[in-house]
């Protein structure tokens, strides 16, 4: 299959990435509803709705802010301004959503951990979205640097590159089943989501070194800086994890 994958149906070119992005939101939400019906949710529906609203607002703002900071250079022309408004990243969305949830919980006075129920739907959504990124090839900035490694692929510019989106798809499958196994052990409420955030942001920190980032601060990208901030945010969980394993 040639990348970017741009199918034409009835003379119209289909934006496969956009379709899969919408599908990711839809199936992710349906999976959340499915899980909530089968879970003894200790958070009342009104509070859960407020939490979802906080997550949505935070994710929207976070994804746009980090989308701009990923490459904060633009020109005052119509194309550049349009690209600026369309710039977004899942990393900013996740961390922004996290902050949005915490703010919403402070406002409504909710003290129960709320993230576990969202964890697997989020992974599903990211997975579907990354399929779209992979099929988009070099049209989306999820491709890697040029490489002679055996995993190198022609993603649309006739250069053998690291297929970053494909690496992430494999990682997400592994992470999904690892977290499922942990969940079956009935660990403390809230830890599944925290482990997801720690694992995903740590993975993204290291995988960013394989991307041809142009805007760097002290040798790392803005996404990597966000990853470090997130890992610092969960420093107690990380420390407890190492202490627990050591004992």
Describe every region a protein language model picked out.
Residues 1-247:
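A feature for loop-to-transmembrane-helix boundaries and adjacent hydrophobic helices
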């Amino acid at each position: 299959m040639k990348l970017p994958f741009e199918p034409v149906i009835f003379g119209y070119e289909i934006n496969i990435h956009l379709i899969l992005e919408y599908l990711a939101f839809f199936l992710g939400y349906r999976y959340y509803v499915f899980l909530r019906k089968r879970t003894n949710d200790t958070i009342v529906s009104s509070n859960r709705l407020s939490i979802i609203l906080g997550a949505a607002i935070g994710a929207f703002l976070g994804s746009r802010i980090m989308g701009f900071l990923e490459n904060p250079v633009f020109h005052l022309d119509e194309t550049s301004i349009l690209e600026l408004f369309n710039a977004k990243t899942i990393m900013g969305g996740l961390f922004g959503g996290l902050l949005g949830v915490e703010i919403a919980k402070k406002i409504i006075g909710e003290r129960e951990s709320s993230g576990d129920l969202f964890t697997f739907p989020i992974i599903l959504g990211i997975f579907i979205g990354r399929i779209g990124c992979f099929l988009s090839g070099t049209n989306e900035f999820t491709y890697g640097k040029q490489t002679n490694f055996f995993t190198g692929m022609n993603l649309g510019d006739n250069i053998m590159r690291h297929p970053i989106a494909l690496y992430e798809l494999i990682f997400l499958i592994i992470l999904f089943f690892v977290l499922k196994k942990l969940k079956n052990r009935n660990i403390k409420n809230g830890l599944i989501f925290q482990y997801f955030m720690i694992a995903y942001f740590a993975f993204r920190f290291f995988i960013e070194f394989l991307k041809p980032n142009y805007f760097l601060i002290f040798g790392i990208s803005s996404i990597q800086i966000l990853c470090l901030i997130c890992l610092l945010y969960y420093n107690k969980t990380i420390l407890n994890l190492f202490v627990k394993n050591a004992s």
